[in-house]
Every structure is written in structure tokens, then in C-alpha cells.
């Protein structure tokens, strides 16, 4: 990873989640991601890469790679974050979840289908933040005139499967043992929501 220096040596291990010390999703704010959020987004992402099968990616992102990832998310493929309320009204609280839309496939025929990603910091799960992020991604996808959203979810990720089902996604296929990570093969469920459906 270019220019990372000691970045990867400093990556944390995989501790168990702690009980949240902050209020639940009712106090969270959803907004477009900014460059100043990238370190916190990377911290959430890198934990999932290194410690879980929630993503099939296997390489953590250094700061350069994280900026390049953000630059690829043009207006048509937004990134949104959930931040917690801050005691200072002029400053955001910490980023505790994020989500993004990405191109589903590079071929032009797929230009109006997006793929979503939703990640919640490990110490803030089970508090509705993933739902807030997904609702905002659906809203923005409609505004951008996408026709459908696809999610590819490892079959053991029950929380993400339930989240997407609650928000109108339906399973349309399963890739059997298509991903190998953390010493085992994983099935990958494909879920889809058409945006012209209720």
C-alpha cells in the first residue's frame, strides 16, 4: 500500500464490541460524507475487512486508498454517514455508520442499477443506524433515477440480510461458495429492490 508507512502495523486487533456509551439512532444525524470523515470511515471499514466476513474484501485501506475510494464516488454514487449529536452545536459528533452506492457493473446497460454497502461501527450496532443509512441511500437513489439497488451479502451476515429485507429487498439468487475469507468458503446472497416498487 503506497505511502502507508507504519499504517498497517498500527491497525488494531479485533476486540469484542463494547456497550455503546451514547444515545441510539434517535440522536443520529444523516448527511453526505465529507473528506474530513474519511479516517473514521476507514476505521469502520478496516475492522470489517480484517475481523469479519461482512465484506469479501481482504485488504485494509490506507489513507491514500481511502481518498481514492471517495473520489470514485461521484454525485451519482453518493456516500452518506451517520454522526452522533455533539455537545458543540458547531461541530459534528463521531461518525458511527456509513453507506454508499456504487456502480453495479461497468457495462453501460447496468448504469441505472446501483450496489449498496452499509457498515455500522462495531460498538454501535443494534440501535437502528443501519436502517437510517439504508433509507437515505434508497431516497438518494430515487432522486438520481436509479431503477434498482442490489446488495451482495455473505450468507452468514444475518443482520444485513434482515436489514435489507425490512426495507423492501428480496433475495434473487445465491452464489454458492463464491468467496473464500477467514479460512472458509462463503455463500453470497444477492438481494434487490426495484425503486419503482412500493
Predicted segment positions?
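Conserved acetyl-CoA-binding loop-helix of GNAT-fold acetyltransferases
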Residues: 126-141, 158, 162-166
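A short beta-loop-alpha structural element at the N-terminal edge
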Residues: 29-43
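Conserved GNAT acetyl-CoA-binding A-motif
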Residues: 141-153
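Conserved catalytic-core motifs of GNAT/GCN5-like acyltransferases
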Residues: 100-103, 108, 150-153, 165, ...
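Conserved GNAT-fold acetyl-CoA-binding loop/helix
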Residues: 42-69
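Acetyl-CoA-dependent GNAT
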Residues: 8, 59-125, 134-135, 140, ...
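A structural signal for short, well-ordered beta-strand segments
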Residues: 116, 149-151, 191
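Acyl-donor-binding surface of acyltransferase catalytic domains
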Residues: 1-24, 193-195
Amino acid at each position: 500500500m503506497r505511502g502507508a508507512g507504519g499504517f498497517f502495523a498500527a491497525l488494531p486487533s479485533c476486540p469484542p464490541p463494547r456497550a455503546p456509551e451514547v444515545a441510539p439512532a434517535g440522536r443520529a444525524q444523516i448527511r453526505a460524507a465529507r473528506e474530513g470523515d474519511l479516517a473514521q470511515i476507514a476505521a469502520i471499514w478496516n475492522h470489517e475487512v480484517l475481523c469479519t466476513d461482512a465484506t469479501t474484501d481482504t485488504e485494509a485501506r490506507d489513507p491514500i486508498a481511502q481518498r481514492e475510494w471517495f473520489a470514485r464516488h461521484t454525485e451519482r454514487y453518493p456516500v452518506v454517514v451517520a454522526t452522533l449529536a455533539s455537545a458543540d452545536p458547531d461541530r459534528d459528533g463521531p461518525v458511527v455508520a456509513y453507506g454508499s452506492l456504487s456502480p453495479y457493473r461497468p457495462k453501460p446497460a447496468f448504469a441505472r442499477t446501483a450496489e449498496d454497502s452499509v457498515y455500522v461501527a462495531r460498538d454501535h450496532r443494534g440501535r437502528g443506524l443501519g436502517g437510517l443509512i439504508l433509507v437515505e441511500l434508497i431516497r438518494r437513489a430515487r432522486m438520481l433515477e436509479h431503477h434498482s439497488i442490489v446488495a451482495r451479502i455473505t450468507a452468514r451476515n444475518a443482520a444485513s440480510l434482515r436489514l435489507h429485507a425490512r426495507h423492501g429487498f428480496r433475495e434473487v439468487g445465491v452464489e454458492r461458495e463464491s468467496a473464500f475469507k477467514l479460512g472458509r468458503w462463503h455463500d453470497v446472497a444477492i438481494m434487490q429492490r426495484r425503486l419503482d416498487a412500493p
